[in-house]
UniProtKB/Swiss-Prot annotation:
Domain tr-type G: residue ranges: 483-653
GO MF terms, alphabetically ordered: GTP binding; GTPase activity; translation initiation factor activity
Annotated segments matching region G3: 539-542
Region called G5, residue ranges: 629-631
HAMAP family linked: IF_2_B (MF_00100_B)
Stretches with biased composition (Low complexity): 185-210, 218-235, 315-338
Protein's UniProt keywords contain Cell membrane: no
Taxonomic placement: Bacteria, Pseudomonadati, Chlorobiota, Chlorobiia, Chlorobiales
Membership in a protein family: Belongs to the TRAFAC class translation factor GTPase superfamily. Classic translation factor GTPase family. IF-2 subfamily.
Keywords: Cytoplasm, GTP-binding, Initiation factor, Nucleotide-binding, Protein biosynthesis
Localisation: Cytoplasm
Region G4, residue ranges: 593-596
One GO location term (cellular component): cytoplasm
Protein name: Translation initiation factor IF-2
Length: 986
């Protein structure tokens, strides 16, 4: 399998989902990078995948951080869920086993014999493998208690805590597992058992259910249960729930202990209330500490486990043979009834999955009122940390914005110091330290500005000279705002009837004045409809070369009328106009033109528009549509009504105050021989009056005259009104903003500042381009260039020509625009063309008499055009002629060597037979042996019957020899061919 087949593919939509960005944004980026993709479902390779992740690195980082935070949150929630589940299980287990505390363990001492009452051990977590057996002697119930049969247990090392006198309870913690009870000296021997014995658990536990072994008490205040001491001796008199045969004897022995005899040495160290202790801990500890405390409380400690194991071992000792008739009885023999009760109790508090799920959900959501204080505090702390982190991020962003310096590309140290709030001396010293020797007014390049700003802790953001010197605009007062006419731009493909529609609306003949019947200028017109309502129309060119003009028209407009010919289809320029309108965020009104023609098909146009993202209202969309005929005037009134309705919905308003400085956009500019520079301006704010000083781009001026589109002089211009302005000192560029200043000096200073920055930028850029071009030509070989000088009637035409010519290029040839300007061709243009070996292109302009004579003298190529199509076609042909031709091989014929002749001083000569074609004396040949090329070169001689010939046709015999090659054999094939040059296309 090829490597390309093994390459992993990725779907664009999956990549966008992983980066959490729009699939359309990823698709647009892939197309910009040259990827051949059709939709978001297309697949891309590893290289494009890496480029996408490199471009969206910030989004990728945010996604990774989000995943990390989400993983930590899920881990924390799962831990809380586990703790909640364990806590619930512990509480259920506690409700099964917890009961009022059992009486403490009693140990009776005498000089040689001891009595040990062991605490119940049945519920210890590790149960014994065998039931504990205690031998008990059977005696009749009528026998006196002074001589009981011996119920003995062999105790090798009895577990007894050191004897203590009866005293007030001390504050020191005492293990409550075994409590000592000193025996008073006046106890009669009849009351003392002959040997130590263990009370059966059925007697001890008949009153209360079993309890787990209580832990060591650590709080002295829980020892307040001491008044229960006198009730302990009543334990032997407890009734039996279900006695058996051997139980009466044990009961009689228990009756022999009297209360007055046990009062002397009984010490009660305290009782443990598990329920109260748990509530207190819940109030003091947080969720995690509560879970740990419950775990320690219900699991036996290592010391207690060893002690329990020791008791179990003691209980398993075999009995003494003195009582042979004693039946071994397990300790839990009488626990059948209690076991039944336990079984019933276990069924009652069964674990409910619904309760557990509810507790888990409450814990996760943090709204459980019964949750521990620690969990609520933890939740509040988490929220507080999140707010602090967001606040820190906002502060960091604001701090970063404060550390950003907005500066032009070639700023002086003085200007840079003012922006950073330091002195110019500091910047000059830093430049010296970096090895750059500058003065206070010297211009710094882009790299130096970035490096200096970084040294002082700032980040440089470069802006244009217009942005750097932008005029601060005051906020409009509500009292000055009035309804203004809408600005409507007519867009569409070439020859679809845009200007014809405007002709019918204006009742004029604009098309008749355009070369070739196509619009090559952007025109602005004001039309009055329905009485006194006004609409400003902008007519844009539909040819592909005028993309910049259409973009400018969409930026200053309020509504776009999209004209589509009903007898044609949706063309590329139609799609481009839709994209311009959507990018500018303006509504679209569709006008289906040429509806009067027989071949008109409006439904097909609507279908194609819906595929382009424009769904008309008739089909459930939001875009209004009107079928019209610009020639016959069908549907024009309805179209204007829809335009005015759209304008009313947008509530267009403008500032009509005379006190506010006026501002507008330059739509088009041209150079008139008698009037000078004339620019078409669309006023956007305020009222433009005659005599106002203004600045527009890098030039300034003073309004000398205002004229409407028909050449009539007017005293002022209101918002949304197009007007032709006279009074510019230099030719402004289309799209520049015109701003009225207070005085002429302010306008001049601002324009000069912009001109200085622009001159420095142009000078540095031209020098750098020349050096780069030299390095590129050395590295890649000489690149052919076609140098041209463009002179046109308007600035918009120059921009369209320049954009169109710059697109006609490839890796070998390109167009180099030496100079471009507005106005007629002069002697200066001719001299520049002669010095740079360039071609002069005049678009709707002619040279003066002196320039024409000078061009003939210098033998320069000066071409004149009126239609932009012809300019682009001729330049493209010229560039194709400059391309290196493609070389193709053309076969002429072949012959077979059938005999070899050895000629002295010449070498081997082949006697050949011409198989096909022709063999020429000067042809290039190759020698083939068994289909393998052996030699490639030329013929040394070609003869027929010892006569030199120029060519031999097929079917004839001839003799031939090869130049500088003598190893020919019978059966070799000689092919003749020639190299043909073919013209290349761009």
């Amino acid at each position: 399998m090829a490597l390309e087949d093994m390459e992993k593919k990725y779907r664009i939509s999956d990549i966008a989902r992983e980066l959490q960005v729009s699939p359309q944004e990823v698709l647009l980026f892939v197309k910009q990078e040259g990827g051949r993709v059709a939709s978001t479902s297309s697949m891309v390779g590893e290289e494009i995948h890496g480029l996408i992740f490199g471009h969206f690195s910030v989004e990728k980082k945010m996604v990774d951080e989000t995943k990390k935070i989400r993983a930590e949150k899920e881990k924390r929630l799962s831990r809380l869920e586990e703790q909640s589940r364990k806590t619930y299980e512990k509480e259920q287990h506690l409700s099964e086993t917890l009961s009022p505390p059992a009486p403490p363990l009693v140990v009776v001492h005498e000089p040689k014999k001891e009595v040990i009452v062991a605490a119940p051990i049945e519920n210890i977590p590790e149960p014994p493998s065998k039931p504990l057996e205690i031998p008990v002697a059977e005696t009749p119930a009528s026998e006196e208690p002074d001589a009981p049969p011996a119920v003995t247990e062999l105790i090798e090392q009895p577990v007894v805590i050191e004897q203590q006198p009866l005293a007030p309870v001390s504050d020191a913690p005492v293990p409550p597992v075994i409590i000592e009870l000193p025996v008073p000296s006046e106890v009669p021997e009849s009351q003392v058992l002959p040997e130590s014995r263990v009370l059966p658990e059925s007697q001890v536990l008949s009153e209360s259910p079993l309890l787990p072994e209580p832990p060591v008490l650590s709080e002295p205040q829980e020892q307040q249960e001491l008044p229960e001491l006198p009730e302990l001796p009543e334990i032997p008199a407890l009734p039996e729930p279900a006695p058996k045969k051997e139980e009466p004897s044990v009961n009689e022995h228990l009756v022999s202990f009297d209360a007055p005899q046990m009062m002397g040495g009984l010490t009660v160290l305290g009782t443990l209330d598990m329920q109260a202790g748990r509530h207190k801990k819940n109030r003091k500890k947080n969720f995690q500490e509560q879970a740990d405390a419950l775990k320690d409380e219900f699991e036996p400690k290592p010391a207690e486990e060893s002690r329990v194991e020791e008791k179990v071992v003691v209980a398993k000792k075999p009995p003494v043979k003195a009582a042979a008739d004693v039946k071994p009885k397990p300790v839990v023999a009488d626990s059948s009834s209690s076991a039944k009760k336990k079984g019933k109790k276990k069924k009652k508090p069964a674990v409910d999955d619904k309760v557990i799920s509810a507790n888990i959900q409450k814990t996760i959501s943090g709204i459980d009122d019964r949750s521990s204080t620690g969990s609520r505090q933890k939740f509040r702390k988490m929220r507080r940390n999140e707010r602090e982190r967001e606040h820190e991020e906002d502060e960091a962003f604001r701090e970063a914005q404060r550390l950003v310096v907005r500066v032009t590309e070639y700023a002086s140290p003085h200007e840079l110091a003012e922006l950073m709030g330091i002195t110019a001396k500091d910047i000059i010293q830093k430049c010296f330290a970096l090895g750059k020797f500058v003065t206070i007014n010297q211009r710094l390049d882009k790299e130096s500005i970035e490096l200096i700003a970084l040294e002082f802790g700032f980040e440089a953001e470069f802006i244009s000279e217009v942005e750097a010197t932008a005029v601060i605009v005051t906020e409009d007062a509500e009292a000055d705002m009035q309804t203004r006419p809408p600005v409507v731009t007519i867009m569409g493909h070439v020859d679809h009837g845009k200007t014809s529609l405007l002709d019918y609306i204006r009742n004029s003949k604009v098309v008749a004045g355009e070369s070739g019947g196509i619009t090559q200028h952007i025109g602005a017109y004001e039309v009055t409809v329905e009485g006194d309502r006004k609409i400003t129309f902008l007519d844009t060119p539909g040819h592909e070369a005028f993309t910049a003009m259409r973009a400018r028209g969409a930026q200053v407009t309020d509504i776009v009328i999209l004209v589509v010919a009903a007898d044609d289809s949706v063309m590329p320029q139609t799609i481009e106009a839709i994209n311009h309108a959507k990018a500018a965020g303006v509504p679209i009104v569709v006008a289906l033109n040429k509806i009067d023609k027989v071949e008109a098909n409006p439904e097909k146009i609507k279908t194609q528009l819906s595929e382009a993202g424009v769904l008309v209202e008739e089909w459930g969309g939001v875009y209004q549509c009107q079928e019209i005929s610009a020639k016959k005037g069908i549907g024009i009134a309805e179209l204007m009504e829809k335009v005015l309705t759209e304008a009313e919905m947008r509530e267009l308003r403008g500032n009509y105050s005379r006190e506010v400085p006026a501002s507008g956009i330059i739509v088009e500019s041209e150079l008139d021989k008698g009037k000078g520079v004339i620019s078409t301006v669309l006023v956007q704010r305020g009222i433009l009056k005659v005599g106002d000083p203004f600045v527009a781009g890098n030039t300034m001026g003073k309004v000398r005259a205002l004229m409407d589109e028909r050449g009539k002089r007017i005293p002022f211009a209101n918002p949304s009104q197009p007007v032709r302005v006279l009074g510019f000192e230099d030719l402004p560029q289309s799209g520049d903003a015109l701003t009225v200043m207070v005085t002429d000096r302010e306008a001049r200073d601002l324009a000069q500042k912009r001109q200085v920055i622009r001159r420095e930028h142009d000078f540095r850029r031209s020098t750098r381009v020349k050096l780069d071009s030299i390095a590129r030509q050395i590295k890649e070989g000489l690149m052919k260039e076609l140098s041209v000088i463009i002179k046109a009637d308007t600035d918009g035409s120059i921009q369209a020509l320049a954009d169109g010519l710059m697109k006609i290029q490839n890796e070998e040839v390109k167009v180099q625009i030496i100079h471009q300007g507005v106005g007629q061709i002069t002697e200066t243009d001719v001299l520049l063309a002669a010095a740079s070996d360039a071609i002069i292109i005049g678009f709707r302009v002619r040279p003066n008499v002196n320039a024409k004579k000078l061009a003939e003298k210098e033998d320069l190529d000066v071409r004149f055009y009126s239609v932009i199509y012809h300019v682009l076609e001729d330049v493209e042909k010229a560039l194709e002629g400059m391309l290196s031709p493609e070389l193709h091989e053309e076969s002429l014929g072949s012959l077979e060597i059938r005999q070899i002749f050895k000629v002295p001083k010449i070498g081997n000569v082949g006697g050949c037979y011409m198989l096909e074609g022709k063999m020429f004396r000067d042809s290039k040949v190759r020698l083939l042996r068994d289909g393998v090329q052996i030699y490639e070169g030329q013929l040394a001689a070609l003869k027929r019957f010892k006569d030199d010939v120029k060519e031999v046709d097929a079917g004839y015999e001839c003799g031939m020899s090869l130049k500088n090659y003598d190893d020919i054999k019978v059966g070799d094939i000689v092919e003749a061919y020639k190299i043909v040059e073919k013209k290349r296309k761009l």
